[in-house]
Amino acid sequence: MVTLEQFRYCPTHSTHPPFCYDFHYVKPGMVAIFGDNGSGKSTLAQLMAGWYPDFLPGEITGTGTLLGTPIGRLPLNEQSATIQLVQQSPYLQLSGCTFSVEEEVAFGPENLCLAEKEIMARIDAALALTECQPLRHRHPATLSGGETQRVVIACAIAMQPKLLILDEAFSRLTPQAREMLLQRLQHWALERGSLIILFERHHTPFLNHCQQAW
């Protein structure tokens, strides 16, 4: 599903030597990439999410493919339907144009022009997986940090991506909520044939839920 071979990304106007990435994983499930702050985790997550070149201008060398397509070649409409990235700050990922959690989770699937019945089914499944049903009619602006983080993950799940990238996406959750979500996401990935890549600083508790780690 994701392959990087001697892959380097050099941002526009960068004065630092680029990181070199080697990564290959093609099976469904959950894997993790660990690294300290400043190690290039978030940049790698954004590259795997297909942000180059539209949102990550610069130059790339080496080989990189996402779901069989070279990095930078996947059309935006296909990319949004197959790859989702959830980052550490949930508030920055809300659309800002909805009045309830239900509308927020529906926003992505509606932009795929799906049938209303399919959209509602995706909303129900995503809210159930993330334990967000009680938040369904709440305004996104009234949510706590942990609640917002679960809603943003629900939005990504509702898109039913083949590749889901979670970049420190559990930072505001309680240990109990984090453990619940990790278990459910692992099961979801295996059931749907999708790949989840976690980007985290600390091994615990994420390593216990992953098939492989780097």
Per-region residue spans from a language model:
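ABC ATPase NBD coupling module
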Residues: 57-59, 69-84, 111
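Catalytic Walker B motif of ABC-type/P-loop ATPase nucleotide-binding domains
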Residues: 164-168
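Hydrophobic anchor residue at the start of the ABC signature
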Residues: 153
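Conserved ABC ATPase "signature" region
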Residues: 106, 117-135
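Conserved catalytic motifs of ABC-family nucleotide-binding domains
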Residues: 160
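Conserved ABC ATPase signature
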Residues: 139-143, 147
